[in-house]
Design a protein with these regions (language model features):
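Active-site neighborhoods and metal-handling regions in enzymes and metal-associated proteins
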Residues: 1-488
C-alpha cells in the first residue's frame, strides 16, 4: 500500500528536511509550484441527470412512517464512521442498517436528520462529505481523499440519487449543538454526533427510536423481497461453487471453502452477510464455527452456513450439511433425515396468523420424538419438551427474522417478535439442528462428532409461505444426486 503523508502527520514524523517558507497553506513538503500544479488542469466531472436509486420511493415511504411515529421531534440517524483495523488501515465500511434503510445511501460519515415542520410532518436532509474541490489539497494529500480511495458523489449528485436534499456534514455537529427542541438519535454509530447531542437526548427516548426502526423492518416491501431473493439466488450459486471444489478443500482446509464462497459473494454482491461457517467433521457441532481452519476429510460431513449480501445490504442465510464424498453413511443419513423431517414440520407451521414460536415448537417436537425413539431420552415426548431435555442436542432456537441484518429486527420488543404473530411480508429462517459433540459420552460412539443443520429462508405469504431457497435440495437423496451432478 502507498503511504500518505498528510498535514495531520505529527511533526516528529515529518521528513527531516529544510524547506523554504511556503505560501500554499499546505505542509512544508509541498512546494508552491507543486501546489499550483495540482490546483489546475482538471476536467469538470460533475454528473447530471442521474436516475434515482431503485429503492428511493420505498425509502421515502419509510421516512414518512417514521415522521408519523415521532411528530414534532428532531430525529438523527447516522451512517457511522470508518473503524480502525490497525494503525492506519480501516475495516471495510458498512453503513448502519437504520441509516441505509431510510436513505439507501452507504457512505461513511453520512447522517440523516428529520427536522420537524410543526406539530406534524418533517423535512429530511442527508448530511454528507461533499467532493473536495481542487483548492485545498484534500483530494490528493489526505488518505481519504479522492486520489487515494476514489471519488465520492457531490451533494448535487447525492440529491439526484437519493431523492433527499443534501448538505455538508462538516457543519452538522455545531448545528446540532445549537439546536433546540426534542431530539432522538440512533446511538452507537457516530461518537461525534452523539457528543453534540449529549445534553439533548436520553437513553430511554433514543431506545424507543431504535426499537421502532427495528420493528418497522419486520414486514418487507416489494423491493426488499426482491433483494432477498437475489441474495438467496447468489447464495445457491455459491453453494454450487463449493461442491465443485471439495476435492481441493480436502487438499487444503476449510479456508478453501470459505474463500470459494466469498468469491461468489464479492462477484455478485457486496460481501458475505456474516462470517461464513465452513464446519467440517466435528466442527459442525460448534454452532458458529468461523475459524474455518480445520481439515476437510472424505467420509465426514460439511456444515456450510453462509449468505451473500446484496449491494443494497440484504442478506441470505442458508445452511446445508453435505457429505464431503457425496454419499451419507447410514448414521449420517439417520440424523440428517431426522433434522429434515423436523424442518419440514417447522416450514409447514409458517403462515399468516401463526405465532412466531409455532414453527420452533413444531420442529422441536419432531426432534424430541426422534431422540426418544433412538433411546437417547426417556419419554414421553411431552415430558421431554416440558423439561427442555432435547436441548442438550438441539441447542438453539429454530429461526429468526432475516433482512438487512442476518438476525434482523433484533431490537424489537418481545411481544412484537418472539411472542408476536406472523404477517405476510415477513421473512425468517427455519433451521433446526442436531449436534452430538465428539466428547458426549451419553450417546453411542457412532453419533459422536456429527452435527447437522438445515436452514432455509422462508417468506410469509398471504396464503402460507414461499421457500426462497428452494433452489437448493434438502432431502438426503436429492442432495446426493445434486452433488454427483455438480462433481461431474
Amino acid at each position: 500500500m502507498a503511504d500518505e503523508l498528510t498535514p495531520e502527520t505529527p511533526e516528529e514524523e515529518q521528513p527531516k528536511k529544510t524547506h523554504k517558507q511556503r505560501k500554499n497553506g499546505l505542509y512544508p513538503g509541498v512546494s508552491d509550484e507543486l501546489a499550483e500544479s495540482m490546483r489546475s488542469g482538471w476536467a469538470d466531472t460533475e454528473l447530471h441527470g442521474l436516475e434515482p436509486i431503485a429503492q428511493a420511493a420505498h425509502t421515502l415511504a419509510r421516512r414518512d412512517a417514521l415522521s408519523r411515529r415521532f411528530p414534532g421531534e428532531r430525529l438523527v440517524i447516522p451512517a457511522g464512521r470508518l473503524k480502525t483495523r490497525s494503525n492506519d488501515t480501516e475495516y471495510p465500511f458498512r453503513a448502519s442498517t437504520e441509516y441505509a434503510y431510510l436513505t439507501g445511501d452507504q457512505t461513511e460519515n453520512g447522517v440523516l436528520v428529520l427536522e420537524p415542520t410543526g406539530p406534524t410532518g418533517h423535512t429530511a436532509t442527508v448530511y454528507l462529505l461533499p467532493r473536495s474541490d481542487r483548492e485545498n489539497g484534500e483530494f490528493w494529500l489526505s488518505g481519504q481523499g479522492e486520489l487515494w480511495v476514489g471519488r465520492r458523489h457531490s451533494l448535487a449528485e447525492a440529491e439526484q440519487l437519493l431523492g433527499i436534499p443534501a448538505k455538508d456534514v462538516r457543519k452538522l455537529a455545531e448545528a446540532l449543538t445549537e439546536a433546540e427542541g426534542p431530539v432522538r438519535a440512533v446511538r452507537g454509530h457516530d461518537a461525534v454526533i452523539e457528543s453534540a447531542l449529549t445534553d439533548k437526548v436520553t437513553k430511554e427516548r433514543d431506545e424507543e427510536l431504535r426499537v421502532y426502526l427495528s420493528e418497522a423492518r419486520a414486514v418487507k416491501d416489494a423491493f426488499e423481497i426482491g433483494e432477498l431473493q437475489k441474495a438467496v439466488d447468489s447464495t445457491v450459486r455459491g453453494f454450487e461453487d463449493v461442491v465443485k471444489v471439495l476435492d481441493k478443500a480436502e487438499a487444503t482446509s476449510e479456508r478453501y471453502i470459505e474463500g470459494t464462497f466469498f468469491l461468489r459473494a464479492r462477484v455478485e454482491g457486496n460481501d458475505v452477510g456474516y462470517g461464513s461457517i465452513c464446519a467440517a467433521g466435528p466442527h459442525a457441532c460448534t454452532l458458529h464455527w468461523v475459524r474455518n481452519d480445520g481439515d476437510v476429510r472424505s467420509g465426514d460431513l460439511l456444515l456450510l452456513d453462509a449468505g451473500v449480501e446484496t449491494h443494497s445490504l440484504y442478506t441470505a442465510d442458508v445452511t446445508r450439511t453435505l457429505p464431503i464424498n457425496g454419499t451419507y453413511t447410514d448414521i449420517q443419513r439417520k440424523i440428517y433425515d431426522a433434522v429434515y423431517e423436523s424442518q419440514e414440520a417447522g416450514i409447514a407451521a409458517v403462515k399468516p396468523g401463526a405465532k412466531f414460536r409455532d414453527f420452533h415448537d413444531a420442529s422441536q417436537h419432531v426432534l424430541a420424538e426422534k431422540l426418544v425413539e433412538w433411546g437417547l431420552l426417556d419419554g414421553p415426548v411431552e415430558r421431554v419438551l416440558e423439561l427442555g431435555l432435547q436441548r442438550r442436542w438441539t441447542l438453539h432456537g429454530t429461526g429468526h427474522m432475516l433482512g438487512m441484518d442476518v438476525h434482523d429486527c433484533a431490537a424489537a420488543r418481545t411481544e412484537a417478535y418472539v411472542e408476536g404473530t406472523l404477517e405476510p411480508g415477513m421473512c425468517l429462517t427455519v433451521e433446526p439442528g442436531l449436534y452430538f459433540q465428539a466428547d458426549d459420552l451419553t450417546v453411542p460412539e457412532e453419533y459422536r462428532g456429527i452435527g447437522v443443520r438445515i436452514e432455509d429462508d422462508i417468506l410469509v405469504t398471504e396464503d402460507g409461505n414461499r421457500n426462497l431457497s428452494a433452489g437448493l435440495p434438502r432431502a438426503s437423496s436429492e442432495v446426493e444426486v445434486w452433488m454427483a451432478r455438480l462433481k461431474g
